[in-house]
């Protein structure tokens, strides 16, 4: 029965709105969101939830400002919508703190997590839900990354090993600054209008403004034994996400 019902909501029921800074520094897209939801003639229905990444992973390493995130959270509450933070790529220390939204002081109703949460690269995904919102029956939510017993063991081991103290956070912060500095040195060798750094923590990259150029960079890197991805709407950002425990 649950399999046939799927998620209960079609993808067409999602409205996508511009991220922080997308329309330039003079336009606050959080205010735009509030205006759309406050105006019955906007064409945007009242949402069940607002979903946001604090740093856009596949979107091109765009970093949302703290004030913008706080405003979006307040707007969600104002319009009686849940706040969902997608921490799949940016959580578990990738941006230094365990949850990427800690610095902004957010309290999401739902948090999605995966990838690094297993600790050792095993398939695992979690959905953290406020107990008052949990209405799922046993077995109702399933998928290929759910219920992997091996991953549960490694995830617990990783949490106990790396998150008992704040040492990993301090290490990620220091190495993130080092990574930023090195990438800035690379970008400065070229025309600033053609190369600039982006990201936060150990989730950094260089925006080359061209998917073709970025593709050439990762191709040459691969030939030299280094696997690097691209992201952004035109694959124009060379994306560097090294292991959190990598040496300096």
Each model region followed by its residue ranges:
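Conserved N-terminal phosphate-binding loop of PLP-dependent enzymes in the Aspartate aminotransferase
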Residues: 1-248
């Amino acid at each position: 029965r649950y399999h046939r019902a799927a998620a209960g909501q079609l993808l067409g029921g999602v409205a996508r709105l511009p991220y922080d800074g997308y329309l330039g520094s003079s336009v606050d897209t959080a205010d735009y969101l509030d205006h759309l939801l406050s105006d019955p003639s906007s064409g945007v229905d009242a949402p069940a939830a607002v979903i946001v990444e604090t740093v856009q992973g596949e979107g091109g390493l765009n970093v949302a400002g703290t004030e913008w995130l706080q405003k979006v959270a307040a707007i969600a509450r104002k319009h009686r919508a849940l706040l969902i933070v997608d921490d799949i790529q940016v959580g578990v220390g990738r941006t230094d703190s365990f949850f990427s939204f800690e610095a902004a002081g957010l309290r999401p109703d739902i948090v999605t997590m995966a990838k690094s949460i297993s600790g050792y690269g095993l398939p695992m995904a979690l959905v953290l839900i406020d107990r008052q919102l949990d209405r799922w029956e046993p077995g109702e939510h399933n998928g290929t990354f759910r219920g992997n017993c091996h991953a549960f063991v490694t995830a617990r081991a990783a949490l106990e090993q790396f998150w008992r103290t704040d040492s990993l956070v301090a290490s990620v912060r220091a190495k993130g600054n080092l990574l930023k500095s090195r990438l800035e040195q690379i970008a400065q060798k070229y025309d600033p209008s053609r190369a600039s750094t982006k990201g936060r923590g150990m989730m950094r990259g260089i925006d080359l403004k061209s998917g073709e150029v970025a593709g050439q960079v990762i191709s040459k890197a691969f030939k030299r034994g280094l696997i690097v991805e691209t992201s952004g709407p035109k694959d124009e950002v060379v994306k560097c996400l090294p292991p959190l425990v990598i040496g300096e």
